[in-house]
Structure formats: structure tokens, C-alpha cells
Amino acid sequence: MISNFFTPCCSFKPVSNCCIGIYNNLSRVNIIIQLEKHMENRLAKFNELVPSTLPFVEGKLEGHKDRKNYSIVGPGVAEDGKQFIKIAMPHSFNLGAVSALPKNGSGLHSHTTAEVFIIYSGRWRFYWGAEGKDETILNAGDIISMPTNMFRAFENAGDEEGLIFVVLGGDDPGIITWVPRVLEKAKKTGMALLNDNSLIDLSVNKIPEGKKILEPIAQEEIKKFDNYKLDQLEKFIFKGNEKSKYENKLNDNINLIQILGNKFEKKEFSPVINQDTGFNLSILKSNKGHITNLKFEKPTIMFSRTGKWEIMIDNFQCVLNSKDTISIPINSNVNIKIDENEDCYLNCVTQI
């Protein structure tokens, strides 16, 4: 239809207002299409993500093999070089997710940047220290922000598959340091790390020329890592069943819980966890509410824990179902709406 209408109009000389109008309309349509494509690249529908089933060196071991790893924003720390990344653009933080069957999870390891776990479903045992002797149990709605320079691990302690979302600090969260026995046990299954921290399956691949197997760290190095007792680590834990103590009114129908950092958009709040992670973590709570004209000056993502949240970003509209994520362009106009029968929760992470 456009071509049939366009041709005769353009036969007039000089060029008619009709042609100019059509050209302008086509330009606007093209811009809208390009904007739609750009925003689609910022939208991560959880059911469209491709997980890695062998994301780390201990992935063939009992207690670790029945799990999936998702890279949603940024590469995270997955050792699988083929891990699918949905939103690759840098945000100064990473977002991932882990699902695991009962009695499965990660081995003891340490990170050089912040690692914040948001429990979506299930019952999880978190344990820490080089021997993994200290532990706590967390449930859906709970959050734990693990300090750097400490060994930590987690295991699904429930009766069915569970899900955790994980926020990691920095564009490059660095490498993982494993306790020696993890690497030693993994090697017996054929899995190893090379000295560039790339993952190799020795049962099907040879060590590339110029590379060698990464050796476990020495006992003297282990002593340099921090140890925490449960009462020391509790200040880094938010229990969802205590949320009413920390709720702030964002407007008449949306409450906010500030977990990390002290800012949501341009408003300041006291955080539940006082820790320098490099990002703000806020939770919006509502069943029927809306908020308009938000504007974020730093890289920001939103991801739904529960409920269908309608998000309008300038002229782009989407619905975030549970587990879906959207990356917000800097200085865009953002409107949020929720219409459910029970309280729902929307997570928001913004660079500090």
C-alpha cells in the first residue's frame, strides 16, 4: 500500500507536501521500529533464556550437577565460555540466576566483588568458611549479601526445585577462587580450569598448547580469607518476613524497602544492609498501585519477583512477569503500574 501511494505523489514536480509527509511518516515509523528493537534487546523474558547446565568446574559432581545457571545482565562469573548472555551491555553490575534440584548447589568459592542472593523460591542452605562449618537457612523473599574475601556456597535444602537471582558487583566480577578440594574432586570427573581460568573437559579435550592446569591455592593462601560466625553475618541478611519494619511510603499505593545503598531514583532511604556493593538494591511492594515520571541517571534494571508489573519507558511498554527483567535507558521517563489481588514485589538495581 505504501509503494502504490508513494509513487504517484512523487511524480509531481516540485516535490509535493504529500511526498514530504509520507517521507516523514516513514522516517518516524523507522525510528519507532529501531527503538522497539533496541528495547527488545533490553528485555529478558525468563522463559526465553538459555541456561548453562555445566557452568562451573564442579558441574559434574554429585550435589552440583543438577543445576542451571543463567546470565541475564552481563557475563557474571560463569566459567562456561559458551554461556548465553541476554543483555550484554555494561551496567556496572551483573545479574544472573541459579536453579537447582534438592541437595544441589555450588561448591565453596570466593569472589572479588559483591555477591547478593535474592531467594525467589525454595528453601536454601548457605554455608561459609574454608570448611563450610557455619550456615543459615533462607527462604523465598530473603536476601543475603555475601562479603568479599570469604568462601561461601549454597544448597537447595527444600523438597523441590528452587530459584535464586544473584547480583554481582562490577562490569567484570573477576574470577572465582575455589577451595582446593573442589578442584581436586572436579579433576576426577575430567573437569579442570586452565591458567587463564577457562573451563576444560579433559575427557574430551586436550590441554591447548601454551596452557596448563590451574593448581589449587596453597593452605597459606586460604588463611588470608576472612571467617565469619553466624552472628557476624546476620547484619548482611534481610528476612522477608520482617519487611514491615523496613517499609517506606514511595507514594499512596506503593511501598519501598531499601536493601542496599541509600537511593531509589532521586530519593534517599536508610538501607537494611549497610555494605558498599557499588549498587543500590530497592524493592517495590504493592498490589494495586502506580508511580509515574521516574528518571534514573545511572544504569538501572528492574526484575519482578512476583506479580505482573506494567512498565512504560518513554513510548515502549512491556509487562514483567515473575522472573522477567528490563534494562532502563538512562534518563528515560519511566511509569510503573501493578494491578493484582495480593502484594507483589519488583526489584530495582541501580549503579551508585
Residue ranges and their predicted role:
Residues 110-140, 150, 294-322:
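A short beta-strand-loop-beta hairpin characteristic of the jelly-roll/cupin
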Residues 9-10, 18-19:
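Cysteine-centered motifs
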Residues 138-158, 169, 313, 320-340:
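Conserved metal-binding segment of the jelly-roll/cupin
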Residues 28-91, 194-285:
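A short, N-terminal "cap"/entry segment at the start of jelly-roll beta-barrel domains
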Residues 5-6, 26:
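Short hydrophobic targeting helices and cationic amphipathic motifs
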